[in-house]
């Protein structure tokens, strides 16, 4: 992709030099102005292509209107290529869903807005990326900044949630490939993050970050169907919820919380300002936590129990999964690049029974985890390293993965963006600051 | 943080993240205070504004945090710093307000000034900039259909329910779905990143409750950066005295340069560079002419 970008830029540059008439203003450019530009270029030792781009951009019409479009009239600038461009052309692995019935593993890719399906046995010791057996990608898919992913092995369908850019749950089938419309979609609250299915109840649970809520829908809900119930309120202890697991075996909802909390009020320009909110509540930074709610909980209901405290080591916990045979919970602990395993019944300031962490593990910025009781494996999706790592199910400590699934060649960097939408320039360090 | 000369697919040179930072993974604004070497970040999901040392790295706590009942912050979205007058400004769409704090404010402190109310016209405030030289504050505020969508320019010391001294917006401006705004202190030129030219679409939900009477449309992907040619975004530049329904005086636009969804804009005034952020990446443009005094479109001489 970098090559494509540079090629595009170079082509534009050639086009501008070859076909573009110099504008009257460009013809009047004094030597001092061009020298100033040359000086700026020379100071940075920018490569030849970038130099050409900058010089061509300098010659764009200044008064005669923009050659490629009539709007805005008589404005300077126009279709100008950048001299530098930073982006990651490869997918990232975010959410993970494991189907041991059909031997598939599905990943959500927030960076390129795609869903990638691989054979469950994909990956190994190779330094090369593995080819997905199926992918969903393109404008028809309505995929935005997607986060969690879930699979229904019986119906051979997979679900994902747009965390931003189109507040939708979309559902695709194993038969879908490429730029295809979802089989069905459901509108969701803004900043929904994860989805978990409850096959026996025929329901699904959705976490909503900004509302500090879990919304429940019928599994096949479409369009603008309303949630059948919602856990939300001060008593719930839901605080920036991310990963969710609908534990039908124990009638519990298990949720990973980052700890950020504010009493959100409507902010959309379509809503009037809300003033009748009762007592003003302060925003808060709470510790990360795993909360357990009754599966039938509805409204402002406290959790049944909570794993929280210094000993837990929880640090921006993301996706979670439950090992029903070992009665354990695994959580992708993004903040310290680890996977932490707790006893399902733990409460309070509990220590993990196992932690997979360290240089040998190759876990970098994990966003999700999946347990395969059938094949005795544990999967980790690494946002920070273009990989998914597969471990023995009870792996512990600083251990190497059994195999690694790559979506880019080994050691390919990643920018780490998750919907970046602002920037600042640090004059002291000559650096660009970007919040996520 | 990326080196200014970073190009291609590169990892950041420095990252501030983790539980101890009190950051979240949802932040839509940032400001750098070059006089005091500090980074200022609004945390929408915690109703807070955090200040970090300029060289902060890894899982480090902020040096100051503005949060609490006196602050009146609910969901601060964007931030600016005025190091000359020692003020931090944030805008909160939930409160429909621009809120000004002392730069050294920490903890549960009341703002020095609040610009909010019907006369201000402010609603979904997604961009904010301060110009201590010309003594103005600029808020970029969106509205769905009708009403005022655009740049609201206030006196720097404006307080309470006051009308803006100038407003840039209207059909000729094509301002609709924009975000970050920046000011070149040398000229006062105003830079705005616009993701696309469609007005903000109505969401299906009011927070976690379905919106009454909401009907789905086929094109409800208003934040999409998929690059629809008819609604592509741009970086627009205005002169400091601009007012009314006017087109930009200077523009960077696509297609072909991956600028379909420019949400953020930052300036390197020394190098005459413009950094545009969006679509999980950023691009740098070298445009010295954008850092000169801009004449009205159609005038005979663009240069000073």
Please identify what each model-predicted range represents.
Chain A
Residues 27-80, 125-126, 299-300:
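Blade/loop signatures of beta-propeller domains
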Residues 81-87, 131-140, 181-186, 227-234, ...:
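A short beta-strand motif characteristic of beta-propeller blades
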Residues 87-102, 139-155, 187-203, 234-249, ...:
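Beta-rich, blade/repeat-based domains predominating
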Residues 110, 120, 163-164, 209, ...:
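Short loop/turn segments immediately following the C-termini of beta-strands
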Residues 113-115, 166-169, 212-214, 261-263, ...:
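Structural signal for beta-propeller blades
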Residues 119-127, 171-178, 216-224, 292-300, ...:
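Short loop/turn segments immediately following beta-strands, especially the blade-tip
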Residues 257-285:
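Short, conserved, GDST-rich strand-edge loop motifs in beta-rich repeat architectures
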